[in-house]
Swiss-Prot record:
Recorded name of the encoding gene: glmU
Residue sites binding UDP-N-acetyl-alpha-D-glucosamine per the record: 6-9, 20, 71, 76-77, 98-100, 135, 150, 165, 223, 329, 347, 362, 373
Biological source species: Burkholderia multivorans (strain ATCC 17616 / 249)
UniProt KW keywords: Acyltransferase, Cell shape, Cell wall biogenesis/degradation, Cytoplasm, Magnesium, Metal-binding, Multifunctional enzyme, Nucleotidyltransferase, Peptidoglycan synthesis, Repeat, Transferase
Segments of this protein annotated with the region Pyrophosphorylase: 1-225
Cofactor info, note text: Binds 1 Mg(2+) ion per subunit.
Pathway(s): Nucleotide-sugar biosynthesis; UDP-N-acetyl-alpha-D-glucosamine biosynthesis; N-acetyl-alpha-D-glucosamine 1-phosphate from alpha-D-glucosamine 6-phosphate (route II): step 2/2; Nucleotide-sugar biosynthesis; UDP-N-acetyl-alpha-D-glucosamine biosynthesis; UDP-N-acetyl-alpha-D-glucosamine from N-acetyl-alpha-D-glucosamine 1-phosphate: step 1/1; Bacterial outer membrane biogenesis; LPS lipid A biosynthesis
Domain of life: Bacteria
Record carries keyword Flavoprotein: no
Subunit note: Homotrimer.
Protein's recorded name: Bifunctional protein GlmU
EC number: 2.7.7.23, 2.3.1.157
Similarity section: In the N-terminal section; belongs to the N-acetylglucosamine-1-phosphate uridyltransferase family. In the C-terminal section; belongs to the transferase hexapeptide repeat family.
């Protein structure tokens, strides 16, 4: 089967320099959703017709299995499909999809393809409570499709028809090429409409078959930012419903955003306003507090992530405790039972089993062993303005508050570092490391007093 995806439109009502089909739903371009669905049907040829912003669109979705046809001048949907004809296998049927209709299920498209087997012409239709503005499907007394009539051309009786044309079709390719060549642009827009092919197929004696989606929203397209927002909420509600069906506890299904793939184990609980991006895995009994952002991360069983935590490109072991207001950046790896508390940032660092950094700390480019306590205000000084260096802290080290570790530096097992120490040399196992300081007390000192105006 050939699949053609129309993605050449200008999208004027989007009021954006970005091509319409590249606007995101759930963190991915509209067109990427359509391509992903198309691939599940295993087409022999997959062609995307580009036009407005063609180079941007190509760059965004280019892949070995995708061919591109160019519609240099925007002359309608029929003209767009015509540009794809040289890339199609004429012996296979062609399914036509739209790059701004992202939520159509693969099962719906398969139903249409199955209905149109043996050389039939298939149309995806949908029945709407309010069909105003759409082309109506007109059937004869036997139920056969006789034509599609546009709103402006419909009779009063035809306007009562609730079944409308979605524009998604499947048809024999050789005949499609012939019909496209016969299209005329005698309309107000001066364009060649793909919908006009239906009448040509009927005149040629082709049987017109239809299929309908399970849900009305599967055929919704995007022409404005308001419609884009509407589809985003529909998609996110679908994701939330699937999570609930899998046993995930959501404090409010209307306040979760999944912009990628979220895999959850048993008894996972997610509070409100959480955003998941990229590829995220939450193991059994994970609890996520409110207002967290988690991107491309794996979270071990029994972990608790408190409110306002940001995690990006990190791996968390089992029973870790993170936040609130913590930040784990790419390369952060936490072993089982590690703690990273409020206003702690970890980047490209390993924190060992049971180690804790509970307050106001920066850990970057570091290897920290097991059972290490990192006091408040500790900083690994990893950057000299040109190069990054690593800090190594062995097992069972106690780091006092307000410590600076100037990398590259190695701290041995069981070391105690006194509060306020700057460590710039390696420290041997088991010692107390401190900077000698003298505390002086002066009598007779008087603090300045503000003068009253």
């Amino acid at each position: 089967m050939n699949i053609v995806i129309l993605a050449a439109g200008t999208g004027k009502r989007m009021r954006s320099a970005l091509p319409k089909v590249l606007h995101p739903v759930a963190g991915r371009p509209l067109l990427s959703h359509v391509i992903a669905t198309a691939r599940t049907l295993q087409p022999s040829r997959l062609v995307v017709v580009v036009g407005h912003g063609a180079e941007q669109v190509r760059a965004a979705v280019a892949a070995p299995d995708i061919q591109f046809a160019v519609q240099a001048e925007q002359l309608g949907t029929g003209h767009a499909v015509r540009q794809a004809l040289p890339l199609l296998d004429p012996a296979q049927p062609t399914l036509v999809l739209y790059g701004d209709v992202p939520l159509t299920r693969a099962s719906t498209l398969q139903r249409l393809v199955d209905a149109a087997r043996d050389g039939r012409y298939g149309i995806l239709t949908v029945t709407l409570d309010d069909p105003t503005g759409y082309g109506r499907i007109v059937r004869d007394a036997s139920g056969f499709v006789t034509r599609i009539v546009e709103q402006k051309d419909a009779t009063p009786d035809e306007l009562k028809i609730a079944e409308i044309n979605t524009g998604i079709i499947v048809t024999p390719t050789a005949q499609l090429a012939m019909w496209l060549g016969a299209l005329k642009n005698e309309n107000a827009q001066g364009e060649y409409y793909l919908t006009d092919v239906v009448e040509l197929a009927i005149e040629a004696g082709f049987e017109i078959v239809t299929a309908q989606p399970d849900e009305e929203w599967e055929t919704l397209g995007v022409n404005s930012k308001a419609q884009l927002a509407e589809l985003e909420r529909i998609h996110q509600r679908n994701v939330a419903d699937a999570l609930l069906a899998d046993g995930v506890t959501l404090a409010d299904p209307a306040r979760i955003d999944v912009r990628g793939t979220l895999r959850c184990g048993r008894d996972v609980s997610i509070d409100v306003n959480c955003v998941f991006e990229g590829d995220v895995t939450l193991a059994d009994n994970v609890t996520i507090g409110a207002n967290c952002v988690i991107r491309n991360a794996s979270v071990g069983a029994g972990t608790r992530i408190d409110a306002f935590t940001h995690i990006d490109g990190a791996e968390l072991g089992a029973h870790t405790v993170i936040g609130p207001y913590a930040r784990l950046r790419p390369g952060a790896q936490l072993a089982d039972e590690a703690h990273v508390g409020n206003f702690v940032e970890v980047k490209n660092a390993v924190i060992g089993h049971g180690s804790k950094a509970n307050h106001l700390t920066y850990i970057g480019d570091a290897d920290i062993g097991a059972r290490v306590n990192i006091g408040a205000g500790t900083i690994t000084c990893n950057y000299d303005g040109a190069n990054k260096f690593r800090t190594v802290i062995e097992d069972d080290v106690f780091v006092g508050s307000d410590t600076q570790l100037v990398a590259p530096v190695h701290v041995g097992r069981g070391v105690t570092i006194a509060a306020g120490t700057t460590v710039w040399k390696d420290v041997a196992d088991g010692v107390l490391a401190l900077n000698e300081k003298t505390q002086t007390a002066k009598s007779g000192y008087v603090r300045p007093v503000k003068k009253k105006s």
